[in-house]
């Protein structure tokens, strides 16, 4: 019978990864207990062992890319812990309104200083648009610039502008931003297109800084769960908006709440408005996320599939356009890590070494996941009744 080390070495060989090797994908093991930990706890054990310094990778993103591209995660993913997590998600609503603020406290309230150091100048915490075409609508500040983007700042500006163009944003439009973050898109939409925005977030720290960054602009920031916007009543339509955007928030909604989410969006959107949903997606339907990500980064988060979204919008929306630029998230995450790593000498006064290894593992393992095309980034444009004459796609 093969030892735990021999079993892991045989698996890694399928991904062309060598223990003790010198290539970017190779790893060094500092604690022999690693092998049993990974076999017993799967991806959770692998991530926690990295945080504990039990192993190191010459290039963590390259290693994870190799492992996922070779499908090695499937060889160790089903264990008692993951089975219990799946059962828990099936029987309970892990993203209920009572738990809605958990992710805000656990992730987005870590400290604005961390995100200011890691992100672009506008503090956009979603995928940048690096593959922006060199030509486009001359009405767009970004599309008419005549060049591809090269920096994180440019990629995020291109993404913000892409969202504005896809919903046909114009002066005077009032927009609901579900999961507004630090108000990045709201500020851009107001300054570049003359819109007004209501942004909602479950993070108190995000809301405080968003209000500061958007001071003096027609932007209202609310600390509010999406289910509290325009509640269903017998009193008519309630609060409605010309358009709705939701950038990087749907991953926190949870499968059991997808119908509720789109029901709320349907009630909030005017009859001729457009709703742009920007979300990370997965190629198969699932009820839970990676156990390490669930425990340390996004509690209660889960990535939707195309099938789950399609089923959830039935009767509420017409899908006008689906745009996948998931490969751009790899580039975005690598840029975020470069910024975070460069700022670490300053940040380490507030965070310990284990946090550094956790955050590094988060950013680089996700980069590897997008590089392996395990995860996608979708921008989906929805209308309530179909755009008369058809929707014109924007890239």
What are these regions (language model features)?
Residues 280-389, 393-395:
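Substrate-binding/catalytic lobe of Class I Rossmann-like enzymes that use SAM or dcSAM, i.e.
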């Amino acid at each position: 019978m093969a030892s735990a080390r021999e079993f892991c070495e045989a698996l890694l060989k399928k991904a062309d990864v060598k223990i003790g090797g010198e290539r970017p994908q190779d790893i060094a093991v500092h604690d022999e207990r690693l092998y049993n930990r990974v076999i017993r706890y799967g991806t959770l054990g692998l991530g926690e062992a990295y945080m504990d310094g039990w192993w190191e990778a010459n290039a963590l993103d390259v290693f994870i890319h190799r492992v996922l591209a070779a499908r090695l995660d499937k060889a160790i993913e089903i264990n008692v812990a993951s089975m219990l997590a799946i059962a828990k998600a099936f029987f309970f609503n892990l993203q209920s309104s009572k738990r809605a603020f958990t992710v805000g406290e656990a992730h987005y309230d870590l400290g604005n200083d961390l995100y200011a150091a890691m992100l672009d100048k506008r503090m956009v915490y979603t995928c940048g648009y690096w593959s922006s075409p060199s030509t486009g609508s001359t009405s767009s500040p970004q599309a008419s610039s005549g060049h591809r983007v090269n920096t994180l700042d440019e990629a995020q500006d291109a993404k913000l502008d892409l969202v504005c163009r896809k919903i046909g944003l114009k002066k005077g439009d009032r927009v609901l931003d579900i999961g507004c973050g630090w108000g990045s898109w709201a500020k851009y939409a107001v300054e570049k297109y003359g819109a007004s925005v209501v942004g909602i977030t479950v993070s108190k720290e995000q809301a405080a800084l968003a209000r500061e960054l958007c001071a003096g602009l027609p932007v209202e920031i609310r600390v509010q769960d999406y289910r509290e916007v325009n509640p269903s009543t017998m009193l008519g339509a309630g609060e409605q908006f010309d358009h709705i955007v939701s950038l990087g928030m749907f991953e926190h909604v949870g499968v059991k709440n997808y119908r509720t989410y789109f029901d709320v969006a349907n009630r909030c959107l005017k009859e001729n408005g457009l709703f742009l949903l920007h979300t990370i997606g997965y190629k198969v339907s699932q009820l839970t996320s990676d156990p390490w990500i669930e425990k340390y980064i996004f509690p209660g988060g889960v990535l939707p599939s195309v099938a789950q979204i399609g089923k959830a919008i039935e009767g509420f929306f017409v899908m006008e356009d689906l745009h996948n630029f998931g490969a751009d998230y790899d580039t975005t995450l690598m840029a975020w890590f470069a910024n975070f790593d460069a700022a670490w000498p300053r940040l380490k006064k507030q965070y310990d070494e284990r946090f550094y290894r956790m955050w590094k593992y988060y950013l680089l393992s996700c980069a590897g996941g997008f590089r392996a095309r395990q995860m996608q980034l979708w921008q989906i444009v929805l209308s309530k009744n179909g755009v008369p004459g058809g929707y014109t796609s924007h890239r």
